[in-house]
């Protein structure tokens, strides 16, 4: 949860920070907080608030993801259990069945090369998950001071 708001998926909170608009934040809250995120709703959100994306989104998205992952770690015992179950291994965010270019940043796609299978991609999410697990739920992050949700500064963790 974030403050008084509970949501089913951390992806909702992650997407809130993409837009610099209290109206966009409230739309997400009203439309997605208690539902699973699906690609159609995400595209609707992006289209509805096109032009309101933070100018620095590409620069801050990884820092914001760290924040979101720490919240999930704090609030979700099953998530913590799953992370510790793969101790010593690097989690892979499998993007094999997706077509979004950003998924090769956050994850990796399984490819075959000369008869061997490899994951190709940056797998930033997998690396962050390993750091989160290995650091007891803490990640260093730096967010801009003007990052607000629902018109208020982001809650410190």
Feature locations, PLM:
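Charged, low-complexity intrinsically disordered segments
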Residues: 1-157
